[in-house]
């Protein structure tokens, strides 16, 4: 038997704000709020095949590019429309040396955590 990813934990300055951003991006809902921690996940709740995201408050600033990032896919619109939606939600473009020929967009959430918007290649859940 193998393990599966059930939670991804993100250290951040504003757990509630970052949780709200990622709820908008992923269509997730807030599942639990305990102290300085906010957990979000699919509407199905805990135990879903998709992992939850936990945002924990930290006072330590981000110092370098993360070695792990999320890739997201639009499920109900094309990549250009999804890019516009994500930018309106608070994402911003990030230049990491792309050539312009890539099939993805590199973005950052409101606290500067990088993620990529890929071409649509998944079905809605």
Please give the residue ranges for each predicted region.
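Short acidic, gly/pro-rich beta-turn/loop elements at beta-sheet edges
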Residues: 18-20, 50, 63-65, 80-82, ...
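Amphipathic alpha-helical segments
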Residues: 14-29, 86-90
């Amino acid at each position: 038997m193998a393990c599966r990813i059930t939670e991804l934990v993100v250290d951040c300055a504003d757990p509630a704000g970052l949780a709200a951003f990622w709820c908008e991006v992923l269509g997730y809902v807030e599942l639990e709020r305990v102290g300085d921690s906010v957990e979000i996940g699919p509407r199905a709740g805990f135990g879903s095949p998709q992992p939850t995201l936990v945002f924990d408050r930290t006072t330590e600033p981000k110092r370098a590019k993360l070695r792990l990032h999320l890739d997201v896919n639009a499920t109900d619109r094309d990549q250009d429309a999804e890019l516009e939606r994500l930018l309106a939600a608070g994402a911003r473009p990030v230049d990491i040396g792309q050539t312009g020929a890539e099939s993805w967009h590199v973005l950052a959430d409101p606290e500067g955590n990088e993620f990529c918007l890929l071409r649509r290649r998944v079905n809605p859940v």
